Amino acid sequence: MSAPSESIAAIEASAVRFREDFAKVRHEIAKAVVGHRAVVDGVLVGLFAGGHVLLEGVPGLGKTLLIRSLSEALHLRFSRIQFTPDLMPADVTGTTIVVETERGREFQFRRGPIFAQIVLADEINRATPKTQSALLEAMQERSVTVGGTTHELEKPFFVMATQNPIEQEGTYPLPEAQLDRFFFKLEVGYSSREELIEILDRTTTGKSPAIERVLDAASIVEHQKLVRQVHVPAEVQDFAVRLVMATHPQGPFATPMVNRFLRFGASPRAAQTIALAAKVQALLDGRSQASFDDVKGSVLPAMRHRCLMNFEAEAEGVDADEVLRNILETVPASAS
């Protein structure tokens, strides 16, 4: 079923401003972050789609700088939570305290750092599962319950978490069910020679320009609503569904590589993520409906953290990205 022509015209007109605002934020981030264009775009796709993003990379690659730069480019309240083994759930969500008032002693809720619009959860896998779940519950419900009282989180609410892939001692890896709550998992790689030279020029000579605020909360919420209005044709939707089902071992669309190397495949949230990311990409291209290529472009960041590899994959050095590329090569766009 296609969208009405009036709706198509309205979406395409709004797409112009969406594309301009996306480019403005990207430009401001680039003032501080050298390179990592795909990672920056992935973070912005997650923001405008209304999801949360997990960044993985070794220390010193600019993950925290990217997130700080984004908060500076947006007129949003920012907080950073450094996850450590001794961090308690109340340190994240807040706690109820007793205060002296004119009327005597009263209970008062003191808000934790989760009550911001952009939250950096730094080294999330260093905290205990109990503390991790406090953050992840807020991500899912967009609210915090303390002492039987529910406190709504302000819109937009965007969490970016970081984790280090090599320091495994003293860490608590996120369980699959909690990883599933992240819209994208983005891998931050090393900079090129030219990028490293540019980093040195900016950080050792005082050349780094100031980041300007180019977007506010109301504009972001408006863009998030626009994304939901983009049409996904039935055949494109079916392609996204078949890609997700192809990750299910022994399923009707599973490839031989999936059957060999995967223990569990992606959940329905993966299909939702792929569809929303495809809608964002369509808007960036000035279109009112998503295409097969839009779907293909979001498969890796949407599903790499939702596929659980088996022992044979670990022994053979096969990762989720390799299996997902095989699926993209094997599953045809058209079902016919």
Predicted regions and their residues:
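Canonical AAA+ ATPase core
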Residues: 99-105, 127-131, 139-230, 279-281
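Pre-Walker A (pre-P-loop) alpha-helix and adjacent loop at the N terminus of AAA/AAA+ ATPase modules
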Residues: 14-61
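Walker A/P-loop
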Residues: 47-85
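Walker B catalytic acidic pair
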Residues: 57, 122-123, 134
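P-loop (Walker A) phosphate-binding loop of NTP-binding proteins
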Residues: 58, 92, 162
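Conserved C-terminal "switch" segment of AAA+ ATPases
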Residues: 11-19, 32, 171, 185-257, ...
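C-terminal engagement/docking regions of AAA+ P-loop ATPases
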Residues: 1-12, 249-336
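Conserved alpha-helical scaffold flanking the Walker A/P-loop in AAA+ ATPase domains
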Residues: 42-45, 98-120
